[in-house]
UniProtKB/Swiss-Prot annotation:
InterPro entries: KH_dom-like_a/b, RbfA, RbfA_dom_sf, Ribosome-bd_factorA_CS. Monomer. Binds 30S ribosomal subunits, but not 50S ribosomal subunits or 70S ribosomes. This is Ribosome-binding factor A. The keyword Aminoacyl-tRNA synthetase does not apply. It is found in: Cytoplasm. Belongs to the RbfA family. Pfam families: RBFA. The keyword Transcription does not apply. It comes from the Bacteria.
């Protein structure tokens, strides 16, 4: 059953990526990238993780509002492309791993610079 769940999650991720690029014209979601999908065991809910190219708080709120507005359209189009008995309800959550990774990169770059300054 886990293997099927993984396949379905991957298919939902691919289809949602296509949908947001081709069918959703809202400029608030133009910088949104879907990173992962986690489905409930009965496939009634799908948590969709997304990231943004910016760390601007206002842009994040606008993107969240744009995704919430487009949720119904995305679910409808997802239902047309998937062969499932029931299309899962979409729940959007911000993926914090991208922000965390960039902070780690900055810290490592700072440490490297400090090390080079000590050697000189």
């Amino acid at each position: 059953m886990k293997h099927r769940k993984g396949r379905v999650e991957g298919e939902i991720l691919r289809e949602l990526t296509k949908i947001i690029r081709k069918n959703i014209r809202d400029p608030r979601v133009s910088n949104v990238t879907f990173t992962a999908v986690e489905c409930s065991n009965d496939f009634s809910y799908a948590t969709v993780y997304y990231s943004l190219l910016t760390e601007d708080e206002q842009a994040q709120k606008e993107a969240e509002a744009g995704l919430e507005k487009a949720k119904g359209t995305m679910r409808h189009l997802l239902g047309q492309s998937l062969t499932m008995y029931k299309v899962p309800e979409l729940i959007f959550k911000r993926d914090q791993s991208v922000i965390y990774g960039s902070k780690i990169d900055r810290l490592l770059a700072d440490l490297k610079k400090q090390e080079q300054d000590r050697q000189n």
